[in-house]
Amino acid sequence: MSKSETLYNLAQQVIPGGVNSPVRAFNGVGGTPLFIERANGAYIYDADGRAYLDYVGSWGPMVLGHNHPAIRHAVTDAVQKGLSFGAPTAAEVEMANLVTELVPSMDMVRMVNSGTEATMSAIRLARGYTGRDKIIKFEGCYHGHADCLLVKAGSGALTMGQPNSPGVPADFVKHTLTCTYNDLNSVRQAFENYPEEIACIIVEPVAGNMNCVPPKADFLPGLRALCDEFGALLIIDEVMTGFRVALGGAQAYYDVDPDLTCLGKIIGGGMPVGAFGGHKEVMSQLAPIGPVYQAGTLSGNPIAMAAGLACLQEVSQPGVHQTLDELTTMLADGLLEKAQQAGIPMVVNHVGGMFGLFFTDAKEVTCYQDVMNCDVERFKQFFHLMLEKRIYLAPSAFEAGFMSIAHSKEDIQRTIDAAEYAFSKMKA
């Protein structure tokens, strides 16, 4: 029995499902989850010491690769001064200045501890600012596990087959309207049904929680126009795309100006950090200068701020995003070519440092229904064949893959070669 199997058996006795986040349990692919002992660069090492080329990247934060020296040294230095103060620090001011510089739509920013906190707080702020209750989200998009957002959700909720979670009262979600991603007509219909009741739209600019589904050219600008027409706020959830798709996030890549932005993952450099921010007029409604309450004991934690600052400073260096894009394109093109050579129908989507693999006969994947029509069983087979070759992909057909600048072209070619092997086995 491997150490991962032993640890998993022990974990299931004291942790529900043996994991602290459902998608880690391998329910989406079957088998025993890997228990990771350490990581460095583009590689993770399991409890038995086996190395895997990693395309999960802790679900997105590790854009520089694992255990980056700049982040490690920043954290080590910060720890010497204390772990938490519960008071303002220079580091959080420096972080706020850097974030607002990199993301021009954010005049002001508030630090929190997770992406869920960021989206939950941004929606509360939008409701407080507009005086309206209803919100619009999209099928297959995931914005954390706040009650009002677990409606036709993606990510682990979709992997577990529970996009609508038990335990969420109907009264909590009656104000949540769900539209079809990449379908502006469905959004207009929602506004026309409730013309003066919708506080905001919240959207993943690239839907990364139903694998990787980019927006159509008119989708994000269309959402902006509809919000302006009906007096609602546009919240762009950049927890996954922020500082990854482009330095200024997907909003810079697609040239759209949101009222509020939610950040997470990369902003913490691997530490638990989230943030939300936006136009000063809206952010000024937050306590202590406004009536909308939001707080957090560990928000702006000095260790987390040190990690996040170091990460953003490195990500801001010239060439980082060009490298990410080149590596991701090389991988996507190589995987698609090998699939076609093997006669296996597949669609590969990619934007910046994100990619998604879909086993489908369709020519494109642009919405939740397209994703649900893909062959999940074939993905499971592909996942385990790649794992056999020590390539670690997300253990779910509904999660995006992530590139880092620590990946080399040799790593990419090794992955393509492994896929060729996997496709040959799948064809047989």
From Swiss-Prot:
User: According to its UniProt record, which cofactors does this protein need?
Assistant: pyridoxal 5'-phosphate
Q: Which branch of life, at top level?
A: Bacteria
**Which pathway is it part of?**
Porphyrin-containing compound metabolism; protoporphyrin-IX biosynthesis; 5-aminolevulinate from L-glutamyl-tRNA(Glu): step 2/2
Signal peptide span: none
Q: Which UniProt keywords apply?
A: Cytoplasm, Isomerase, Porphyrin biosynthesis, Pyridoxal phosphate
Q: What is its main location?
A: cytoplasm
GO terms in the biological process aspect are: protoporphyrinogen IX biosynthetic process
One GO MF term, please? pyridoxal phosphate binding
Q: Which CDD domains match?
A: OAT_like
List the GO terms this entry assigns under cellular component, sorted alphabetically: cytoplasm
Question: What family is this?
Answer: Belongs to the class-III pyridoxal-phosphate-dependent aminotransferase family. HemL subfamily.
PANTHER family assigned to the protein according to its UniProt record, in alphabetical order:
GLUTAMATE-1-SEMIALDEHYDE 2,1-AMINOMUTASE, GLUTAMATE-1-SEMIALDEHYDE 2,1-AMINOMUTASE 1, CHLOROPLASTIC-RELATED
> NCBIfam families of this UniProt entry?
hemL (TIGR00713), PRK00062.1 (NF000818)
Protein name per UniProt: Glutamate-1-semialdehyde 2,1-aminomutase
- In its UniProt entry, the species of origin is given as Proteus mirabilis (strain HI4320)
